């Protein structure tokens, strides 16, 4: 027999508070239409697996029961502007819209990391992670003074990407992996 995931009789539904403020306006005999919305959603009690139990205890994270501890925030705005008119027998309409939304992991039960950039808490949901670039190697002097790169067995040539040693330990390794670029969900 094998041991499976433990149950948790105390789990509950996730909770969400949503706020939405909108304005709609029509002008110039209803030819110009403007719609603007601002929204915010705060979610708490998100069901997640605790990442705070060290592996030294011999308990696999997959066998730990899920608990309601996650907290996220999402907010943004939407703006739609439309113009509709008629010239003779020709009817036309033009419209354009823009939306912006940014989310953030406010709290996630995760193991302590030595550097803040290694956490999910404080960053966007689905944030991409990778090595931070500081341009390209342009001179032999830059190549000679670079940190040891554990990902490439320290091979580098002129024109290769120059990565940043974020923690200053002289190595380019998994402790230098940080949030880069935009998250998986576009903001605009």
Question: Where are each of the predicted segments found?
Answer:
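Active-site beta-strand/loop architecture of penicillin-binding DD-peptidases
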Residues: 39-45, 51-67, 175-187
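Outer-membrane beta-barrel signature, preferentially recognizing the C-terminal barrel domain
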Residues: 1-33, 62-87, 124-129, 181-187
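Short amphipathic alpha-helical segments, especially helix-boundary/capping motifs
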Residues: 1, 51-58, 165-168
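Conserved small-residue
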Residues: 67, 86-183
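Short capping/connector residues at structural and topological boundaries
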Residues: 16, 52, 72-74, 136, ...
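Membrane-embedded beta-barrel scaffold of Gram-negative outer-membrane proteins
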Residues: 13-58, 92, 99
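Glycine-rich, flexible loop/turn motifs
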Residues: 2, 7, 43-46, 65, ...
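Flexible, surface-exposed loop regions and adjacent strand-edge segments
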Residues: 50-61, 109-119
């Amino acid at each position: 027999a094998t041991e499976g995931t433990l149950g948790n009789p105390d789990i509950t539904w996730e909770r969400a508070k949503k706020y939405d403020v909108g304005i709609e306006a029509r002008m110039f005999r209803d030819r110009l239409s403007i719609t603007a919305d601002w929204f915010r959603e705060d979610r708490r009690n998100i069901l997640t697996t605790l990442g705070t139990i060290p592996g030294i205890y011999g308990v696999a994270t997959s066998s730990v029961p899920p608990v309601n501890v996650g907290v996220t925030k999402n907010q943004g705005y939407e703006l739609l502007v439309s113009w509709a008119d008629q010239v003779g027998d020709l009817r036309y309409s033009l419209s354009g819209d823009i939306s912006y939304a940014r989310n953030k992991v406010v709290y996630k039960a995760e193991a302590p990391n030595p550097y803040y950039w290694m956490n999910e808490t404080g960053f966007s949901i689905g944030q991409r992670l990778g090595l931070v670039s500081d341009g390209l190697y342009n001179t032999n002097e830059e190549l000679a003074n670079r940190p040891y790169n554990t990902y490439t067995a320290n091979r580098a040539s002129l024109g290769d990407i120059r990565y940043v040693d974020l923690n200053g330990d002289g190595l380019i390794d998994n402790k230098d992996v940080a949030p880069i670029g935009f998250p998986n969900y576009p903001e605009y």
